[in-house]
């Protein structure tokens, strides 16, 4: 059976839930990965209003869609981050509160616990998202990092996320971290450290997204192979990395996405540098049968055109694994 092809609604949060569901169906998708921002899925309402979950399920059914995951990247970011003014623009007012760091982190952690509970009520087994990181600002070790600075960051991550993951365990939901710059895990080495910091508990895995590895020169196929049993969700997303030197390198030069001076940028699926044939074969080898969720980003392309072509691209690319050895027919019986 082909894997379901879904659309992540995070980049469509300016549209009402009913509208993006109708569009996703018209684009050819089997379902959606619902963002917990905009009006798409509101965690507080899901837990306080018995009719809210039914209203969401009714809209999905009306359009013949399934929901395979919900995502709460924005609130998750605040759990471990060093909180500053930037977070105010991405957090609900009830999470931001007075903006004091300890309070924001505490409220964000509680919201992630509630996100697991809301996912269970919706009948969803995976929550994708971010963790934030207290040590991301120390990525480039100058002035030199004291020896305990980074290990303390992983300990802080475990202190914040183990209680959250206890709730995930209680309700039978898994958390899938999207390894990404600014998170506790952003490549293979940091992902290994994050898993170990949590004692290798099974409720913590990854929302695999190759686009965030290609511009770092990380082995994005090797990531699947390394964490084959922890790939809980997959983002289909592409990025272009220039083969030639550019004015702004991997760090971005403080210039916006879409600027031609950048060394890399996100592109519609199949138009960047990711080898999706290799990705698909590695996912097959890993036994991944979950959704292939299109996170569509391309600042130079109309998003409806892009979402439609991305759906078709994934369908052409996906294929079932073989149940036989191709050369078995050569044997004499």
What is each stretch, according to the model?
Residues 3-5, 19, 31, 70, ...:
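Acidic/histidine-rich catalytic cores of soluble enzymes
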Residues 23, 62, 79-206, 304, ...:
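Active-site acidic/histidine proton-transfer and metal-coordination neighborhood
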Residues 7, 24, 32, 60, ...:
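Conserved, mostly hydrophobic/aromatic
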Residues 18-38, 122-123:
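Catalytic domains of carbohydrate-active enzymes, especially glycoside hydrolases
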Residues 8-12, 35-39, 72-75, 132-134, ...:
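Active-site beta-loop-alpha junctions enriched in small/polar residues
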Residues 13-24, 107-117, 215-224, 276-278:
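Short, acidic/polar
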Residues 35-57, 131-138:
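Glycine-rich, proline-tolerant flexible connector loops at the mouths of alpha/beta enzymes
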Residues 303-323, 330:
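C-terminal helical cap(s) of enzyme catalytic domains, especially alpha/beta-barrels
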